[in-house]
């Protein structure tokens, strides 16, 4: 078993029989505890986490292909969801390392706190670009491309030409936008942003539209979809994509790399807590 920098070895699958899925949707949920109870029932044979709130859900799960297929079908079709998740997109990748050790379904006030009150992203996907459209946008002269992730993620990998807002948490992003939005408008720049799976960008875009009357172009499905659907993604993607699970990082082909949590966080005092958490989760 390969030990990727921790005191105890991680669970490593002998074959790529384990898969990871990421999914989210902003949708009005009236009874979040009831929805969470149904999700707990549907994930009894899976590992990972799902957050449920009045604004929707956000999840990452791992398991065998058949179990994930059953969950995906149920989330889209189970009558107990009243069609709230019909057509929801899933981003799937094969695993070598087991991403999670347990299953958690929690009810929260928000599935993704931006740190700004009153942001409503339900039914407001904004301007979504598919991978081909995103590639064309990267070559445009009038676009500022913002990496809507934490700075340590940007350092590990990024799209060519992207700007690092230098934030340590999603809740820090509004301050970056507030400082720069007047300049973008004065220069006549279009604003585009990307994140790992798309959820950060969708919520940020809703806020920026309301606060600054600014329409934001987003990479639909995020980095994960781009890498999955673009055979030559390495032309645009530089480095590795950080993921918030025990795999740590993926290359442009969505393959796990040898990067460890210590490689990502070591030397950054502000991120020491993340390293400690990663080590703790890997040891459980």
Give the location of each predicted region.
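Residue-level preference for short coil/turn positions at secondary-structure junctions
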Residues: 139-141, 187-188
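Rhodanese-like catalytic fold shared by cysteine-dependent sulfurtransferases
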Residues: 6-9, 14-125, 149-191, 199-284
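Structural scaffold elements adjacent to functional motifs in cytosolic proteins
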Residues: 145-147
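Internal catalytic-core helix/loop-beta-alpha segment
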Residues: 119-140
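Cofactor-cradling patches in redox/metallo enzymes
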Residues: 194
